[in-house]
Curated annotation (Swiss-Prot):
One of its GO terms (cellular component) is extracellular region. One of its GO terms (biological process) is killing of cells of another organism. The keyword Ribosomal protein does not apply. Disulfide bonds join C18-C24. Belongs to the frog skin active peptide (FSAP) family. Brevinin subfamily. Has antibacterial activity against E.coli ATCC 25992 (MIC=49 uM), E.coli CIB 84492 (MIC=25 uM), S.aureus ATCC 25923 (MIC=6 uM) and S.aureus CIB 85462 (MIC=3 uM). This is Brevinin-1JDc. Keywords: Amphibian defense peptide, Antibiotic, Antimicrobial, Disulfide bond, Fungicide, Secreted. It is found in: Secreted. Its main location: secreted. Expressed by the skin glands.
Length: 24
């Protein structure tokens, strides 16, 4: 993967987990 993709994933994954767990 490109570094840019990893950067995006690093931001998206915690956000998705936050929304699913509803512990924002």
């Amino acid at each position: 993967f490109l570094p840019a993709v990893l950067r995006v994933a690093a931001k998206v994954v915690p956000t998705v987990f936050c929304l699913i767990s509803k512990k924002c």
